[in-house]
């Protein structure tokens, strides 16, 4: 499956989600453009946030992804899954609040996990756990959608005021081509993580999925309405199923 096929699958589900929840595409567009403008306006004082450096961050992440086994971490992850992946030399990309699992470990193991963490995929609602990633300068894959403007604005302000802000890659969920942003496909932070890894060239069957469940709201989910979240998780599972069905056997 090519990177563009991965994105196509993920984007089709985005369209279905908007229809299911009656969310206007224009709201997604407005949020994306506002995030882009906000980050661009701060790039004069944060050189790593310029459009050129954000492109370099994509290239750097892609190179690291292709340099060994990779695990995508979802909100229902448990400690045993993390330890097993760590022992088999996986690197990690965490989906939003799932990064909170790291605090469950003793300090030496915690440090090993942080050293293997490549990025955090977030729509900025995974507090308080995502703050730890910023403090560790973990690359943020920051997403804009129609109802998270306040969340991403708060996060951008918080990390822009840090002495050493993390590097950023910006994502959106519109069908438009937006210079300085990506739409790798996917809807929740969890399936967007998988789509991103696949879009950057890792074959879908080679991605280890930790903590991906659609029957429960995971322990590490951000602030959310449980009933609504379960409806969203159905679409996450659809993305995963379609990616696996389309992957070469």
Protein language model regions, located:
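Extended interaction regions within the primary functional domain
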Residues: 112, 130, 161-162, 181-184, ...
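Glycine-rich beta-alpha loop segments
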Residues: 83-88, 95
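N-terminal donor/sugar-recognition subdomains of glycan-related enzymes
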Residues: 1-70, 80-83, 217-249
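Short, surface-exposed, charge-dense and proline/glycine-enriched linear segments
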Residues: 85-87, 133-134, 199-204, 238-245
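Acidic/Gly/His-enriched mid-domain segments of enzyme catalytic cores or analogous surface patches
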Residues: 49, 56, 64-67, 90-91, ...
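Charged/polar interaction segments and conserved charged motifs
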Residues: 1-5, 91-118, 226, 233-241, ...
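Glycine-rich anion-binding loop/nest that anchors nucleotide
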Residues: 71-77, 96, 182-192, 204-220
């Amino acid at each position: 499956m090519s990177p563009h096929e991965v994105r196509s699958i993920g984007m089709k589900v985005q369209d279905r989600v908007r229809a299911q929840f009656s969310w206007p595409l224009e709201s997604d567009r407005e949020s994306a453009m506002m995030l882009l403008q906000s980050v661009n306006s701060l790039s004069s004082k944060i050189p790593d946030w310029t459009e050129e450096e954000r492109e370099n961050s994509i290239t750097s992440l892609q190179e690291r992804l292709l340099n060994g086994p990779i695990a995508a971490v979802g909100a229902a992850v448990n400690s045993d899954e993390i330890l097993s992946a760590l022992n088999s030399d996986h690197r990690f990309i965490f989906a939003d609040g799932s990064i909170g699992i790291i605090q469950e470990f003793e300090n030496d193991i915690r440090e090993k996990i942080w050293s293997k963490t490549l990025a955090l995929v977030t729509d900025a609602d995974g507090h308080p756990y995502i703050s730890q990633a910023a403090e560790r300068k973990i690359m943020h894959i920051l997403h804009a959608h129609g109802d998270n403007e306040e969340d991403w604005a708060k996060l951008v302000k918080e990390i822009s005021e840090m002495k050493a802000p993390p590097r950023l890659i910006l994502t959106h969920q519109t069908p438009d081509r937006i210079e300085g942003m990506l739409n790798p496909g996917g809807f929740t932070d969890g399936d967007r993580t998988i789509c991103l890894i696949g879009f950057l060239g890792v074959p879908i069957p080679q991605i280890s999925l930790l903590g991906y469940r659609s029957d429960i709201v995971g322990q590490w989910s951000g602030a959310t309405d449980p009933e609504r979240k379960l409806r969203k998780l159905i679409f996450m599972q659809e993305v995963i199923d379609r990616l696996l069905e389309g992957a070469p056997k």
